[in-house]
Amino acid sequence: MPRGLELLIAQTILQGFDAQYGRFLEVTSGAQQRFEQADWHAVQQAMKSRIHLYDHHVGLVVEQLRCITDGKSTDADFLLRVKEHYTRLLPDYPRFEIAESFFNSVYCRLFDHRSLTPERLFIFSSQPERRFRTIPRPLAKDFFPDHGWEPLLMRILSDLPLCLPWQNKSRDIRYIIAHLTETLGEDALPRCHVQVANELFYRNKAAWLVGKLTTPDGTLPFLLPIHRTDEGELFVDTCLTTTAEASIVFGFARSYFMVYAPLPAALVEWLREILPGKTTAELYMAIGCQKHAKTESYREYLCYLAESDEKFIEAPGIRGMVMLVFTLPGFDRVFKIIKDKFAPQKEMSAAHVRACYQLVKEHDRVGRMADTQEFENFVLDKRQIDPALMALLRQEAPEKITDLGEHIVIRHLYIERRMVPLNIWLEQVEGQQLRDAIEEYGNAIRQLAAANIFPGDMLFKNFGVTRHGRVVFYDYDEICYMTEVNFRDIPPARYPEDELASEPWYSVSPGDVFPEEFRHWLCADPRIGPLFEEMHADLFRADYWRALQTRIKEGHVEDVYAYRRRQRFSVRYETDRRPDKAFAPPSGNVRRA
């Protein structure tokens, strides 16, 4: 290879990333218009297209590099020089951290995920940690209650870039002040002030105002979800001021926010204070930089591994028929491998399973489906693998594993947030905790269905409980769109003997689902059955599911709330306006999405 080509290749990769992130910002900048026009289907399409942008631009750069090198092979020294030149381009580059991830992606695409070493890749960043600790330009604006909280909030809401009229701005301000007074106390409120992010955070059918509430006792989140009525008027739906509430809003089971972030590292640094429990990976994930979040997630894994002497073990819970799941005892994530052969009742291919996981990545997860990161050629030290797990890997997924002596390479796996399996949780709790879990499970099913997702296998073992007590679906191999399912009532038995027969007396076609059958496996536990019948009996009726299908086919997009229904201003304080459709969830049982 001629000298000087290394710099050209480095510049080509960085220019390719520039093009990708430019398109990323372009799609993101359309969020306000989509919100104001209530173009909810365009919101969903923009979410999918933005996810695809990264891989598309990696592919474009790879083709450019193949043209530049004329298809000639490159040696190790040449690749090291390319990385050196690329590293020299980054100190003054505003998105250096994601540019490093983009370089990694291009390398992996070129070399089919082989020879993934720190010398060739940015396994760890080449730049100082948290380089934007001092933000180069303001990301937020401060507001002080010099003349009271009412004019302060009026300034905040009036400064928003939204062009729609307000339904009743003064009323919403009263509600916010009422909430702050209840939360902080009337005496403390005059000594507090707010810092508000310059950009709104868009997701689903809401525009979120994200801020920091500085109190005498510390800094709290200040989150206002802004919705629009069917008539095109704005209103504030609630005010959230606890770190637990903010953590759920920015949770791993939710779609990525659309927030205009030309300096993503600076925004992540700004968010840390109100989301202290979130890792760097989770913060990048929340603002839509999911590929760099994968890089950060891997770095967090390596750091944990370096400080731990734990061994990988099979994850607790009922062993899956499709996936082999393992973890480290103290680590908050699990590793999932598609088995080489599935149980006989699982009539599907590995390609189908991967397509299901991709569907979840691109779909609105409504707070009820865990996000995943996909890895290829994942290396594990055999000394850190429990012998029982090693035997299981060789038994269930030998075609996915390459033995390199001291290490094994797993050809493909997913990393996902670790949760307590719901079936285990239900065995351990009683009273109100049991009731809350059953309510959460039913709500998860409802909200997934309203988002056009049918879980397929609804057994408790396929759901997990998060640290906030939320129930989240995580087994995707039978997932499908609601519109693909034929929900049927079980026909009346012809003879008394029919109900005792081992085979059904009625025909069953592919895609047929009989909701009455859910009762058999969801209500078998005498502690659970009465609670289910009380709160979620309609899930056993085919007409409930068919009604949801009709709404979906008519183009209706349900509201998704990242908080409990009782926290909404319309429920807490509503006295001076008639209820409207914007405040009515599809079921009275829906609490939080």
Curated annotation (Swiss-Prot):
Its EC number is 2.7.11.5, 3.1.3.-. Its main location: cytoplasm. InterPro entries: AceK_kinase (IPR046855), AceK_regulatory (IPR046854), Isocitrate_DH_AceK (IPR010452). It catalyses: L-seryl-[isocitrate dehydrogenase] + ATP = O-phospho-L-seryl-[isocitrate dehydrogenase] + ADP + H(+). Signal peptide: none annotated. It is found in: Cytoplasm. GO terms for biological process: glucose metabolic process; glyoxylate cycle; tricarboxylic acid cycle. ATP binds at residues 315-321, 336. Keywords: ATP-binding, Cytoplasm, Glyoxylate bypass, Hydrolase, Kinase, Nucleotide-binding, Protein phosphatase, Serine/threonine-protein kinase, Transferase, Tricarboxylic acid cycle. GO terms for molecular function: [isocitrate dehydrogenase (NADP+)] kinase activity; AMP binding; ATP binding; phosphoprotein phosphatase activity; protein serine/threonine kinase activity. It holds the Pfam family AceK_kinase. The keyword Hydrolase applies. Disulfide bonds: none annotated. GO terms for cellular component: cytoplasm. The active site is at residue 371. Transmembrane segments: none annotated. Belongs to the AceK family. Bifunctional enzyme which can phosphorylate or dephosphorylate isocitrate dehydrogenase (IDH) on a specific serine residue. This is a regulatory mechanism which enables bacteria to bypass the Krebs cycle via the glyoxylate shunt in response to the source of carbon. When bacteria are grown on glucose, IDH is fully active and unphosphorylated, but when grown on acetate or ethanol, the activity of IDH declines drastically concomitant with its phosphorylation. This is Isocitrate dehydrogenase kinase/phosphatase. It comes from Salmonella typhi. The lineage of its organism: Bacteria, Pseudomonadati, Pseudomonadota, Gammaproteobacteria, Enterobacterales.
